[in-house]
Amino acid sequence: MTEMAAADFGQCAISNQPSMHLPYLYSAIGNIGKAARYVRRILREGYNENVFPGDEDNGSMSAWYIFGVLGFYPVCPGSGKYVLGVCNARNITVKLGSGNILNIINETDGSSAFRVSFNGANIKENFIAHDKLMRGGTLRFYTEV
């Protein structure tokens, strides 16, 4: 249980893998703003160039960090869907294994995303399909509705 106490974020024991999805459950039920606040706090307070919350656990803490910065997370691994959050960088370019490019653009004011689009089409759901991202394109987070 020492792993759960290593990072004090209340019931969200981010240093323990069974809790890594908890901030994104807010987004899954439609409250992206609350998810964004938790994720940003964890990124800011739990990570730096020398520290992970808890131990690295064969890449799981690094993977959580990367998803937190990208703005989406696999709440239900294997489902083929990522729950949307908020991108925590201004612009990201990901070169996919297929050679396709995924551009992620953050146009939010830093609080939350009220609108997300993929290749110019608004995303009405609170998730995006893995297959869609793997084809490449532009995922854009906006503050305005």
For the regions a protein language model found, what residue spans apply to each?
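Active-site core of glycosidic bond-cleaving carbohydrate-active enzymes
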Residues: 1-101, 131-138
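A short, compositionally biased
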Residues: 85-91, 106-114
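C-terminal beta-sandwich/jelly-roll accessory domains of carbohydrate-active enzymes
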Residues: 101, 108-145
